[in-house]
Amino acid sequence: AAINHRFVQELFDGTIENKVLKDYLIQDYHFFDAFLSMLGACVAHADQLESKLRFAKQLGFLEADEDGYFQKAFKELKVSENDYLEVTLHPVTKAFQELMYSAVSSSDYAHLLVMLVIAEGLYLDWGSKDLALPEAYIHSEWINLHRGPFFAEWVQFLVDELNRVGKGLEDLTELQERWNQAVALELAFFDIGYDA
């Protein structure tokens, strides 16, 4: 459903309204905060050194590339620091944050991986659409951050880790519940910019 969402179509077409993109990015910046906490928790709780190092590498990428995009996009969209830091969170953003922070506080690597596979896998799905990129930086760069060999390798790493860790678990009920909640929230997140 997300791959054909109105938000994705308009982003690729370059026709998404600035207000819609602005509202989405402001909320996504708060998602980004909790997302970084999940990656940090994975560095702490992954069961193999190689895995810890891969998460550390991704944290460096996010600091340089993704946060850089947010700062440039906010400037272009004329969003002040106060506007994106001191904002009322949308109920979907709040619910997503709570789900992510509950994974962090669980200290459970498998629960963290479920959240990451959903978040990143869904974005790879729509980011990899075989369509021409829009001209504007604020549109094309958000797509570029979620496609290409580096991002695809990252998502495959997450899937492989979840498969590896999940094989040793007897009861997958809680993981399945978390998975279902995360999928529903990811889909609802695309509607944020259109709600106002």
Question: Where on the chain are the PLM-derived regions?
Answer:
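Acidic interhelical loop/turn segments
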Residues: L133-S140, N163-T173
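A generic alpha-helix surface/boundary motif
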Residues: R6, L36-S37, G68, K94
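Surface-exposed helix-capping loop/turn segments at secondary-structure junctions
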Residues: A41, H45, L49, V79, ...
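Short alpha-helical hairpin
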Residues: A1-I16, F35, F157-G168
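Long hydrophobic alpha-helical segments typical of transmembrane helices together
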Residues: K167-A196
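Active-site-proximal alpha-helical scaffolds that flank and shape metal-associated catalytic sites
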Residues: I26, E50-E153, N180, A184
